[in-house]
Structure formats: structure tokens, C-alpha cells
Amino acid sequence: MKKVFTVYCLLLFIGASAQRFPDAVFLPNIRTAKLFSQNNQESMAIVRLNSSDLLELHFDDVDPTPKNYYYSLELCNADWTPADVNTFDYISGFTQVHLSEFRPSSITQSRYIHYQTLLPNKNCMPTKSGNYMLRVFLDGDTSQVAFTKRMFVVDYNKAMISAIVQQPYDNQLNKTHQKLQLSVNTMALNPINPQQQIQVVILQNYRWDNTCLLYTSPSPRD
């Protein structure tokens, strides 16, 4: 028996309490840190598990002196707290990867260095689906974090999601709200306690500062 979780909600776009670990920049010399699907700067940082999907990481350092930046990937829970799992249970390869591709600015009044890379790669490959925190840090020292970014590894063989956006029945909400009919087919997941294990997070234009967090009850279907 497959289980389908159906949710009807009005998107109020209020901040969710699960927002504990936002994307952040920690060094003042870092500018325009971006992480997105390859060749699509407007996309979220999502890759399919065991696929050839790639993400592009870009950022500028306004200090014109080249530095040794590294990145790491950490599996997180639904609320973006670190998962209590050994790194090598979800990463194949190294725990840190050196960012070796960079170039100095040219024909600009302000000097800076642009760093970029494609990930994941064979040096650091996620082996489990889930929420991942990308950390960029200096000199292989994880205490010198430059910035963090969220990314997602998805497995469509485990669950499928479908959604229909509709106008609210209340005319007073037509211009400010949306009604969402959402179905999550867990297929191979078979959660034991779906009320705790299944969470749905709604984003408005990829924004994390006003997420809508939903908890659902199962509706079994054959």
C-alpha cells in the first residue's frame, strides 16, 4: 500500500520556527556568494542522488591576495541542525575539498579575486539524499568559516511530490494569498511516524526568511 499525504493550506508566508541555520556570510571580504544548478543562476541548489547533476559555486573575495579556500558538506536534519551521523556514512571521498579555480579581476576599479567550482565531484560525493550544508572555510580550518549555503540531494525513487496552486475562496485574500493542494507519495519510504518524520516547507521565491512549515497526517491509498 502506498501512502499519500495530502495538504490544503493558505500560504501566509510567515517565518517558521525551524529556521535555525540560515545561509550566512561570516567574513567581511566575501561578496556575491552563490550556489545554483549548473547553467541556471535562478535555480535552487538541487541535485539528484547518483546522477551527473552539478552545482556551480561562485564567490568574490575583495582582498586581492589569493587564499586557500576549502569546502565541506554536512548532512542536516529538517530544521538544518547537524544530523547525528558519521560523515563517511553520507560522503564518499574526502571531507574537505580545495577550491583551486580562481581568477583576479580585470578592467575594474576595485580589485578582487573570483573563486568558482563545480560540485559534487568524485572527491566529495553525497551518498544519501537529504539537506546538506555547504561550508567554505580558510586554510583547511573549519573554525574559519567564510560562508555557508544550503543544498539538497533528492531521490525521486523514494518519494514524489505534486502540487497545484489555486486562488483562495475568500475574495479578500485573492491578491495576497495562495491556496496550495499538495500531495507527497512516500512510495519506498514507508515512514513509521509520518506526523514527525514528514515535514513540508513552503518557500516564496526561494526565500528562507519567511518559510511556511507544515505538518501532515497520512491518507493511505492503494
Where are these regions (language model features)?
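Ligand-binding face of N-terminal immunoglobulin V-set domains in extracellular IgSF glycoproteins
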Residues: 115-121
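A short beta-turn/strand-edge loop motif at beta-sheet boundaries
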Residues: 63-67, 126, 189-195
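Conserved small/polar residues in nucleotide/adenosyl-binding loops
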Residues: 215-222
